[in-house]
């Protein structure tokens, strides 16, 4: 068996634990089965009161670069300055403890205690992301040149995310309204 790449396994771990946390919070969620093109980039589908309507959840997983920040996702490039990055109804940002993310070796040492969850409605996720990317693009490099946004990790200060930490009730409230 080939060795697991952390860049891939962290994303899969984030999706799996978000699925579990939904059910732990009474939210009936299901995997999209890799059919993301049919589900606006979503990883999970949530049942609502109306069997014809579903909520979509996108999961983004990573380790924050700084203790007081929350990792959102990688920037695709200048195209992220225009339009919306996220299309799902909610984005769950799963942040791994940075030390444990680097040191674990798929031996069971990575646990729920090493994870933080930020449950963010689409409009808020897009606003937070856009604000950070716009500021990064406007900030010149030391040599005065323009910063390249492609593949840049996007973080926000943790204090901007406090209202979203473990906010599973937001999904439940939206589910019951629908």
Language-model features, listed with the residues they occupy:
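Mixed-charge (Asp/Glu-Lys/Arg
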Residues: 1-40, 45-178
